[in-house]
Design a protein with these regions (language model features):
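N-terminal pre-core extensions flanking Radical SAM catalytic domains
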Residues: 1-125, 143, 315-364
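Short clusters of small/polar residues that mark proteolytic maturation junctions
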Residues: 25-26, 161, 418
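Conserved alpha-helical substructure of the radical SAM core
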Residues: 31-34, 39, 73, 77-204, ...
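Conserved, mostly hydrophobic/aromatic
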Residues: 42, 206, 249
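Conserved strand-turn element in the central/C-terminal portion of the radical SAM core barrel
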Residues: 232-259, 280-282, 326
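Catalytic cores of alpha/beta
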Residues: 255-271
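Boundary detector for helix-to-coil junctions that initiate low-complexity/charged tails
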Residues: 345-423
Length: 423
């Protein structure tokens, strides 16, 4: 790994419904779109100034344009295994796209509360527009491509456009293999055969977020737990028959599901799947971020979450924990950590009502609360030998005109958004 570099900008591209093209998942990079497929030629996009500059940075092991909180090879072995290669294997002067992810359609047959608040289906005019671009724009990109991926924005089996596009690819490019990101309900033997890809599968990712039907129904609205497990059973047989390279099950950690984590890992084992744990990001979805983010020490269930995380077997080769979550598995003295987290949390009893009526902690005047914390430490007879310097630090951060506080507790950093009153 020492001298390996990320292959993504030399091999991959992701295309969104508006035509914007990225060299990596936009959540994992600070880089803007390198072009637009509806207004530019592929050569203009792939060899654009932005693309070349990004590749040159990666070539020199400069990852300043990457979001290392989400994609860090030092803390996320999966990233290291699949994305980092020997530089000698890369054609710096004439890179060719080998993997294209099409995130064109937001249509989905369920409403995961992590993602959206209702089922979404493209209007017919939008589907017709995308279908009109299949032969004109999308298919010419696929010469030399080895894998196509559907989709980062919806469910490929619920999208009329994606289903049609996939059928056309399978007919014209029989050697291309497929990665699918899906909720799994429509990922059946019948649908895979209907699209002509059942013998061309590479990886299937399924967003599960649970290990029990009760938890599943809280998070996945309009889902079908029994049908999902039937399809998982089928996919596990494909793994056994070497007809599917990899099955990945995703779990975004929330206050509603974190207690399912141990059972989820066992469920993955049952279905010959790799288990992926992700931290909830304040991007979209129906939740009030503070109320569900058990990673923050102010959350009332943070202690319970920490104990579960520190008991995980991180040596499990089929368990992948995102960098933002992995740090919680590395706490050496759980009782000491929780003592200081609890003391700090007890100083923050002011609460507010958010737009959706869910209560969450308000973080104001943190420096003053640290002073109160010092008094609490004295009351609890905790030794003060430089303890605040060792345990806590507070700093301000400004980004995108938003104010944040960064608090460090026992070496773990927590970034809090400072909200205005009335929010």
């Amino acid at each position: 790994m020492k001298n390996n570099i990320c292959k993504a900008p030399f091999f991959t591209a992701e295309i969104f419904g508006g035509g914007d093209v990225y060299l990596c998942c936009p959540s994992y990079t600070k880089l803007n779109a390198i072009g637009n497929i509806f207004t530019q030629s592929w050569d203009e996009i792939w060899n654009s100034k932005e693309a070349v500059e990004f590749r040159n940075k990666i070539k020199n092991s400069d990852y300043s344009d990457c979001n290392m909180n989400y994609c860090n090879p030092n803390f996320f072995p999966f990233c290291r295994e699949v994305a980092y290669v020997d530089p000698a294997k890369l054609d710096y002067d004439n890179p060719k796209v080998r993997i294209i992810k099409f995130s064109l359609d937001r249509s989905c047959n369920v409403a995961c509360t992590i993602c959206r608040d209702k089922v979404y289906c493209n209007e017919e005019c939008r589907t017709n527009f995308l279908n009109s671009k299949i032969d004109e724009v999308f298919m010419p990109l696929l010469d030399g491509v080895e894998i196509v991926n559907f989709t980062g924005t919806g469910d490929p089996f619920a999208s009329k456009h994606d289903r049609e596009f996939i059928k056309r690819i399978a007919q014209k490019y029989p050697n291309i293999r497929y990665d699918f990101h899906t909720n799994g309900i429509l990922c059946s033997k019948e649908n895979l055969e209907r699209m002509g890809v059942i013998d061309k599968l590479s990886t299937i990712q399924i967003s599960l977020h649970s290990a029990t039907e009760e938890t599943y129904n809280k998070i996945v609205k309009f889902g079908n737990w029994k049908l999902l497990n039937k399809n998982l059973e089928f996919l596990s047989h494909l793994i056994e028959q070497n007809k599917l390279n990899e099955l990945q099950l995703n779990f975004v950690v929330l206050s509603e599901n974190y207690k399912d984590i141990p059972a989820f890992i066992q469920l993955c084992k049952k279905y010959h799947a790799k288990a992926f744990l992700w931290q909830y990001r304040d991007i979209e979805g129906v939740y009030d971020y503070d109320s569900v983010n058990v990673c923050y020490p102010l959350h009332r269930e943070h202690a319970s979450f920490i104990r579960i995380m520190t008991e995980l077997d991180t040596s499990n080769p089929d368990l992948f924990i995102s960098p933002l979550l992995r740090k919680y598995t590395q706490i050496k003295n759980v009782d000491e950590y929780l003592l200081y987290a609890d003391i700090f949390s007890n100083q923050n009893n002011e609460r507010y009502e958010s737009k959706n009526g869910i209560l969450g902690p308000r973080l104001f005047n943190i420096e003053q609360q640290i002073k109160q914390l010092q008094l609490s430490m004295e009351d609890n007879k905790v030794k003060k030998d430089n303890i605040l310097k060792r345990i806590f630090s507070v700093e301000n951060k400004y980004s995108n005109n938003a104010k944040h506080k960064i608090i460090t507790i026992l070496g773990l950093k927590f970034i809090f958004k400072i909200r205005n009153k009335g929010v």
